[in-house]
C-alpha cells in the first residue's frame, strides 16, 4: 500500500515533466531546415500532429486527470492508501506508452511526409512508414492498460 498523498504528488510532478517534454517536442517546428510547416501539409504529416495530440492527451492532460481523480478519492471518500503495485504499473505503462506512441508516430510521419514531398509514390511512402506502425500501436495499447490499472486501483480502494 502507498499513501494517496504520495501518489497525488507523483502524478502532479509527472504532469509538469510531461508538459516540459511537450514543449520540447515543439522545437523541431522552429528549425527551418526540417520544413515541418510544409511537411504537415502532406498526407503522412498528419501523423506528426496526431502524435503530438496523443502525447498531450495521454501524458499531460491524462496525468492531470489522474491527479484530480486520486485527490477526489482522498478528499471525498477519505481513502488514505491505494495499491502500490497498481500505481507504479499505471505510471510506467502510461509514460512509456505515451512516449512510444508519440516518438514513433512523429518519426514515421516525418519520414513519410519527407518522402511524399520529394515526389515518391504513395505506395513507397507507405512502405517507408511501416517501421513505425507496430511500436505506435504498442504505445497506444500501453496507454490503455495504464488507464485500466488506474481504474482498477480506484475500484479496489472504494471496496476497502
Predicted features and spans:
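Active-site-proximal inter-transmembrane loops
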Residues: 43
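Hydrophobic cores of alpha-helical transmembrane segments in multi-pass integral membrane proteins
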Residues: 10-36, 46-77, 85-125, 129-158
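Short, Lys/Arg-rich, polar N-terminal cytosolic tail immediately upstream
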Residues: 1-4
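Rossmann-like adenosine-cofactor binding region
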Residues: 81
Amino acid at each position: 500500500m502507498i499513501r494517496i498523498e504520495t501518489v497525488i504528488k507523483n502524478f502532479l510532478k509527472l504532469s509538469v515533466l510531461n508538459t516540459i517534454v511537450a514543449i520540447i517536442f515543439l522545437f523541431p517546428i522552429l528549425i527551418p531546415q526540417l520544413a515541418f510547416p510544409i511537411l504537415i501539409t502532406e498526407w503522412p504529416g498528419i501523423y506528426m500532429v496526431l502524435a503530438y495530440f496523443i502525447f498531450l492527451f495521454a501524458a499531460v492532460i491524462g496525468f492531470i486527470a489522474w491527479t484530480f481523480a486520486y485527490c477526489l478519492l482522498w478528499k471525498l471518500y477519505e481513502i488514505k492508501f491505494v495499491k502500490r503495485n497498481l500505481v507504479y504499473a499505471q505510471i510506467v505503462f502510461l509514460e512509456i506508452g505515451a512516449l512510444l506512441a508519440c516518438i514513433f508516430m512523429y518519426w514515421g510521419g516525418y519520414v513519410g511526409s519527407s518522402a511524399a514531398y520529394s515526389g515518391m509514390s504513395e505506395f513507397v511512402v507507405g512502405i517507408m512508414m511501416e517501421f513505425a506502425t507496430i511500436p505506435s500501436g504498442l504505445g497506444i495499447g500501453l496507454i490503455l492498460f495504464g488507464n485500466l490499472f488506474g481504474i482498477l486501483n480506484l475500484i479496489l480502494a472504494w471496496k476497502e
